Amino acid sequence: MKRFLLWIISVALGVALLLAAVMGVSYAFTTQGGCPDAAAQFGGQELETNGFCWQVPLLGGRLDKVFASPATLTVQKLGTLYTAHPDITLPDWASYTTLTIQTAVGSVVFAGSVSEYQSFLFPANGEYKAEMTLWRVPKGGMATQFEGGSTGALRKNLGLERPAKPTGWYRYSFRFTLQASADIAFSAERVEQGGIVGVRISGMTGDTAPAVETDLGSVQCVRAADGWRAYIPAAYNASSGGHAVNVAVNGETLTHTLVVLPKDFGTVEVDPEPAATDAANAEFRNAVWGLYEAPAREKLWAGGFVNPAENSMTLVDYGQVKVTNGQQGSRSNSTKLYTIPGEPCRAPANGVVVLARNLALTGNTVVIDHGAGMRSYLYGLQAIAVSEGQTVEKGQAVGALGEELTMDYKLGSKSVNPWLLFQTAGGLFWKENG
């Protein structure tokens, strides 16, 4: 029995020595090279690490070996960056990130994750300092579970993933000077009467909307993923030739010239229209005119518009000169359709109903705001099925059609050609998704 016990003890000691040897070899051969690649970029420039701590698995993930370097006061200088929103490129392994950006005097302008940074706008050009930490944490784990330590220390692996992988972080400290200049692009240099020109303004700092001025109409800018968007109307009666467009942004004014081309919309015979009463005109002005210059909401439409009347015949078209008893009169800023009573009147595009009521001048009236100053004015419905403030989707019934529907599509106060909207043509749909 004594010999057997001695044998058991010797075997156990041998196994322990073998495990110790294996662990020693594993420990010795586990080097800093087992840490993930630290490659990260800001504004297209490679960032240098300023401190790290990693736990690299040993023995199949039962233990971790620590590799660490403390952060220092060193700050990498990136120089001058000329884009308003420098891109951040991360390594594939980064699962949790923190980023802090402050001005030269220490005021924090951003604190959050790298994904949240994507929607951040720098308040102004100038000098900035940033600190970024990139973590690799196992799925189901948290950064607070990370023990860390000094190089060479052993830690118990969390056991949250198989095979076990390194867990830890790299820190980056860098400073840069932002010197961005606005970039303005137009969907076209020339536009026919009735058309729309899209404007994209990018590469600017701050959240103050650019100001666009032109004699073609009132233009408002709205936020977009790449900066700001605006839409310029060339109404049926816009004078042909060059029109200056002045864009004020970041303290500078840039001037561009758009050329309006004439278009022959033809003529149409119409019956004399009865004169409206002063009361009806006043009611219409009070209800509708204020919408022309109302603040623009975010862009809500997506893709082309649909004709509110699925089945119709055109009686008076946009831009046509109305002829009564052989005498030429005014040009039509709207389109009048012969429609089938009782059929649905459809929302031309996504939007918000801003007017839904009966008016003496135009009958049952629905106005839908599609954002960016673009609105649909629908007159003469048999019945109204929506209320003011209601959100509607393209094709949704907003009421029932009568015998005639008058539709007017305006950017601000200027009417545009509806058929271009139905054909998804022109600047309203230019680079819709960026």
Q: Each PLM stretch: what is its role?
A:
Residues 366-369, 390-434:
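Conserved, short, structured surface segments that act as functional micro-motifs
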Residues 169-171, 177-257:
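Cationic-aromatic interfacial patches
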Residues 344-354, 386-401:
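Short, well-structured beta-strand-loop connectors
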Residues 119-129, 234-241:
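Surface-exposed, short loops/turns at beta-strand junctions within beta-sandwich domains
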